[in-house]
């Protein structure tokens, strides 16, 4: 992954800075976004590439997932391409340097680049060493460290790569986590990132909890554990093993979840739609379907460093 990041960083010197059309500015989460299209969590896990990613055209960059405790993630290999499906399988396991280190890095970045940064979201998750029953305090620690420097907080309870994490999506388990994060948020916007594999009624329940707690939004969706409908040979998929699937195969379910959320949230909370977005037409369709902002990641891997630039041009 570091090699991929480095390749994209070097590409920045060869292209001009791209800014989305002024007509596409978006007012959301108490901020003015230079466009609706941002980079999803998972690429810049340690907040090392925020400014270069803005230079590539992303209006917002969601760093992480960050955990309170530094951790190496799962053993390699842990990231696999399925080119025939324009998809990735990852079981990274929240590898990151820990909330305190990453918060210090963002603080320094804000001091040295006060006007040249995108909107910065901090995606926070449970430390692997922490038991599920202690998750609220673990999320609290991450929120306390990152809230002073992030523009919004994204509570990730939907990665399939941390044991027990997805059990935290139930309303009963999620409520104390969100209460803890809210107490440490310094008033920064809080969004919940959900899995596409949740049953429809559970998605609606989470949306209602967001409204009840007067939180700021939902990010829909994370990766899926489903392998349905892939054209990649079964033996190749099985060789990749367990992990979250992202990319084009996620498109339809992610869009369906957006259609579920819109009538529940009714514009009272922001929806960031992510999953299977590759083109400006797809991004525009998500906006038309009720998303306030859209994100991508796997398309960045398959379509290269000019990907955001092309989408921004077409969204003008």
Language-model-detected regions and their locations in the chain:
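A gly/proline- and charged-residue-enriched helix-loop-helix capping module
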Residues: 64-116
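Catalytic cores of alpha/beta
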Residues: 46-55, 198-213, 262-267, 277-294
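Short beta-strand/loop segments at the ligand-binding rim of alpha/beta enzyme cores
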Residues: 30-38, 115-122, 184-198, 263-273
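Glycine-rich phosphate-binding active-site loops on the catalytic face of alpha/beta enzymes
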Residues: 57-71, 217-227, 276-277, 282-310
């Amino acid at each position: 992954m570091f090699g991929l990041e480095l390749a994209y960083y070097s590409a920045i010197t060869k292209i001009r800075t791209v800014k989305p059309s002024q007509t596409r500015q978006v007012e959301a989460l108490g901020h003015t976004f230079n466009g609706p299209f941002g980079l999803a969590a998972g690429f810049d896990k340690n907040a090392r590439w925020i400014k270069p990613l803005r230079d590539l055209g992303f209006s917002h960059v969601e760093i992480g997932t960050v955990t309170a405790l530094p951790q190496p993630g799962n053993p390699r290999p842990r990231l696999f391409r399925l080119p025939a499906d324009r998809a990735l399988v990852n079981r990274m396991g929240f590898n990151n340097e820990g909330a305190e280190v990453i918060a210090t890095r963002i603080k320094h970045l804000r001091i040295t680049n006060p006007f040249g940064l995108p909107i910065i979201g901090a995606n926070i998750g449970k430390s692997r060493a922490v038991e599920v029953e202690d998750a609220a305090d673990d999320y609290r620690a991450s929120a306390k460290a990152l809230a002073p420097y992030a523009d919004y907080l994204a509570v990730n309870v939907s990665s399939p790569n941390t044991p027990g994490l997805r059990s935290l999506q139930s309303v009963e388990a999620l409520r104390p986590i969100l209460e803890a994060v809210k107490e440490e948020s310094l008033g920064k916007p809080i969004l919940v990132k959900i899995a596409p594999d949740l049953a429809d009624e559970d998605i609606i329940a989470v949306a209602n909890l967001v409204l009840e707690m007067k939180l700021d939004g939902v990010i829909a969706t994370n990766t899926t554990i489903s392998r349905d409908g892939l054209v990649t040979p079964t033996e190749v998929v099985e060789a990749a093993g367990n992990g979250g699937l992202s990319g084009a195969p996620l498109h339809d379910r992610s869009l369906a979840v957006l259609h579920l959320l819109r009538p529940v949230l009714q514009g009272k909370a922001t929806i960031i739609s992510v999953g299977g977005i590759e083109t400006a037409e797809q991004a525009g369709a998500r906006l038309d379907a009720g998303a306030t902002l859209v994100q991508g990641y796997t398309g960045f891997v398959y379509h290269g460093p000019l990907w955001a630039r092309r989408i921004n041009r077409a969204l003008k």
